[in-house]
Amino acid sequence: MKLNVSYPATGCQKLFEVNDEHKLRVFYEKHMGQVVEADILGDEWKGYMLRISGGNDKQGFPMKQGVLTHDRVRLLLKKGHSCYRPRRTGERKRKSVRGCIVDANMSVLALVIVKKGEKDIPGLTDTSVPRRLGPKRASKIRKLYNLSKVDDVRPYVIRRPLPAKDNKKAISKAPKIQRLITPVVLQRKRRRIALKKKRQAASKEAAADYAKLLAQRKKESKAKREEAKRRRSASMRESKSSISSDKK
């Protein structure tokens, strides 16, 4: 079995091939996310703690977190699920994945060093790979350099040098800072708030006009009903008086 070990502190990863079944037994029947002591792998691993982050079986099917079995299952996966990338919007597909329990049928096991031991491992903990890109968001640049909200973050952007071309000056490239508070951003915010207040005032005025018109219409309809009621009562009195005069 191959062990793909990574160390986030240095940004390095290295592939180790272990053929001794006794050394690998420490990983068997363990779930993804569990932490394992790596002392059994050798003297250089003494004191190291490894977290199981994934793996593939001998046919290349990946392990999936949450599937509590060591066999292969077919699951209906959609956007947002691991082990699947949809090609169309809303597409779902039934894919074969392996459970999150490690057994002897694994070909590669992905491990992350949680705790470093006494000795350095060549190519993994003794060297450091610098990050190619720095932070892009303004709040993360402030956090990296311990800046306050009033400090300007633009001078602190990590620039990436580009190789010089034929007879040209070497240049560097910097990312566009996201969520940077500038006077234009504040002006747009003020405009949004002003438009919102204007819409609220307009809707309040329209509601008042509608309520006024509704009250007027109700008053007019009530007056019409009362007028019709008076006319009916007057016509009934006239008809009664005419009937009584005819009888005399």
UniProtKB/Swiss-Prot annotation:
<dbReference type="GO" id="GO:0005840">
    <property type="term" value="C:ribosome"/>
</dbReference>
<dbReference type="InterPro" id="IPR014401">
    <property type="entry name" value="Ribosomal_eS6-like"/>
</dbReference>
<feature type="compositionally biased region" description="Basic and acidic residues">
    <location>
        <begin position="223"/>
        <end position="248"/>
    </location>
</feature>
<keyword id="KW-0689">Ribosomal protein</keyword>
<dbReference type="GO" id="GO:0005737">
    <property type="term" value="C:cytoplasm"/>
</dbReference>
<dbReference type="GO" id="GO:0003735">
    <property type="term" value="F:structural constituent of ribosome"/>
</dbReference>
<feature type="region of interest" description="Disordered">
    <location>
        <begin position="213"/>
        <end position="248"/>
    </location>
</feature>
<dbReference type="InterPro" id="IPR018282">
    <property type="entry name" value="Ribosomal_eS6_CS"/>
</dbReference>
<keyword id="KW-0597">Phosphoprotein</keyword>
<dbReference type="InterPro" id="IPR001377">
    <property type="entry name" value="Ribosomal_eS6"/>
</dbReference>
<dbReference type="GO" id="GO:0005730">
    <property type="term" value="C:nucleolus"/>
</dbReference>
<comment type="subunit">
    <text>Component of the small ribosomal subunit. Part of the small subunit (SSU) processome, composed of more than 70 proteins and the RNA chaperone small nucleolar RNA (snoRNA) U3.</text>
</comment>
<dbReference type="GO" id="GO:0032040">
    <property type="term" value="C:small-subunit processome"/>
</dbReference>
<comment type="similarity">
    <text>Belongs to the eukaryotic ribosomal protein eS6 family.</text>
</comment>
<keyword id="KW-0687">Ribonucleoprotein</keyword>
<dbReference type="GO" id="GO:0006412">
    <property type="term" value="P:translation"/>
</dbReference>
<dbReference type="Pfam" id="PF01092">
    <property type="entry name" value="Ribosomal_S6e"/>
</dbReference>
<keyword id="KW-0963">Cytoplasm</keyword>
<protein>
    <recommendedName>
        <fullName>Small ribosomal subunit protein eS6</fullName>
    </recommendedName>
</protein>
<dbReference type="GO" id="GO:0042274">
    <property type="term" value="P:ribosomal small subunit biogenesis"/>
</dbReference>
<keyword id="KW-0539">Nucleus</keyword>
<comment type="function">
    <text>Component of the 40S small ribosomal subunit. Plays an important role in controlling cell growth and proliferation through the selective translation of particular classes of mRNA. Part of the small subunit (SSU) processome, first precursor of the small eukaryotic ribosomal subunit.</text>
</comment>
